Amino acid sequence: MFESLWLQLQHPNTQWVLAGTLLLGTASGVLGSFVLLRKQSLIGDAMAHSALPGVCLAFLFTGQKSLPFFLLGAALAGLLGTFCIQLIPRLSKTKEDSAIGIVLSVFFGVGIILLTYIQQQGAGSQSGLDSFLFGQAASLVRQDIILIAGISAVLLLLCIVFFKEFTLITFDLAFAKGLGIPVRFLNGLLACLIVCAVVIGLQTVGVILMAAMLITPAITARYWTERLTGMIIIAGITGGVSGVAGTLLSTTMKGMATGPLMILSATLLFLFSMICAPKRGLAAKAIRLMRLRRRTSREQVLLAIYEQYEKNNLCVTVESVRKKRRLSPSLCLKALNDLEQERCIERIENGIWQITSKGIEKGYHTALKQRMYEVYLMHEMELANIESDQDYFDPDRLPRETRERLYSLLKLYGRMPERRKASHDAEKGQIANEF
């Protein structure tokens, strides 16, 4: 397999296709980042479907299969579709998503009708226009690939030159207008770049799948970073890798189109990112949720033990803790073992624990934090200027006046935690009445 792949890579046409799909994937990923952040993912799909009638009309007017004419016709049809998407909501009460659906289906339907008409003509069956539906990179010749690679390189260059301006109109359009930046021109330029990226991918990826090539690398990159620069770089790399992987797979798998394999490669990278990304991935979220659940159960068990300590019941069991907190036996036992490892409690008999001096101190602060938060919720209108999230509520960071006010309310309600220390000898001999 590897020997045949190596032999295929020595072929000049394979090398040109690899270079073309690499640049196409990179340009699609970079521009797709702006499309995703501007919440215009469906517009890319509509542009791709709108391009089909332009390809068919270009063939009808020229009578020959010429990729430059096809790209020109597809670009004009894509721009017309984009204009219609923006025009329909202005002239009617139709929302933008409905306008996208209308334009997508109407243009694609017209394209299918024209494609069927062409293939019923004498030379239509030889035109190969059906390759624009799903893509057929193997049918590209050297001149076609040079054209696609050249346009992709120009798109990347323009994205680099106008990076600051595109970033500004993506995140804060009103601020850009206030600075006197030509927003309308930049929006039009970005739309033209997106149309060009869609158009040059039609012969390789196809009308139906090109939107996925535009969006999937951007979504993949979003899992790995919070910064736009990093997102664009990762999206470009993801798109390029997907293009190369799809080309290599189609080279080794006879009869398989390059476009679907490129999308499949991008989808696999997306699934890997969705699961394994360090911050946004499902695995990382599951680990954080598990740690949060374990920390919360540990705090709840410590609070239950501390409340027993305030009532002079120094020893606890799993059942006595579960009477105070609704926890499963396994989770409660795990929390008790964690507290024992932290030296907040110590085991005096099998299944019986007692609180230590460290546990008293930690339980005091935990109880104080929770009870102050409860009092804050009772007087939220009076104390509305402090952090309202319990996870970030820290009494030590509160203003002195606010903290003293909460202390006085705790004393008023009799909820102030006790900080007394019991003698260790007395603790060892005392067992709670529940046992």
Swiss-Prot record:
Looking up CDD domains in the UniProt record yields: TM_ABC_iron-siderophores_like (cd06550)
Q: Which GO terms describe its cellular component?
A: ATP-binding cassette (ABC) transporter complex; plasma membrane
Q: Matching Pfam families, A to Z?
A: ABC-3
Indicate the transmembrane segments per the record: 17-37, 42-62, 68-88, 98-118, 143-163, 166-186, 189-209, 228-248, 255-275
**GO biological-process terms attached to the record:** monoatomic ion transport; response to zinc ion; transmembrane transport
Report the principal subcellular site: membrane
Alphabetically sorted, this entry's keywords are: Cell membrane, Ion transport, Membrane, Transmembrane, Transmembrane helix, Transport
What induces or represses this gene? Repressed by MntR in the presence of manganese.
Record localization: Cell membrane
For this protein, the record's InterPro entries field holds: ABC_BtuC-like (IPR037294), ABC_TroCD (IPR001626), WH-like_DNA-bd_sf (IPR036388), WH_DNA-bd_sf (IPR036390)
**What is the membrane topology noted in the UniProt record heading this document?**
Multi-pass membrane protein
Look up the domain of life of the source.
Bacteria
The UniProt function text for this chain reads: Probably part of the ABC transporter complex MntABCD involved in manganese import. Probably responsible for the translocation of the substrate across the membrane.
- Please give the subunit comment from the record: The complex is probably composed of two ATP-binding proteins (MntB), two transmembrane proteins (MntC and MntD) and a solute-binding protein (MntA).
Family listed:
Belongs to the ABC-3 integral membrane protein family.
Q: What is this protein called?
A: Manganese transport system membrane protein MntC
User: Organism source for this protein?
Assistant: Bacillus subtilis (strain 168)
Gene name on record?
mntC
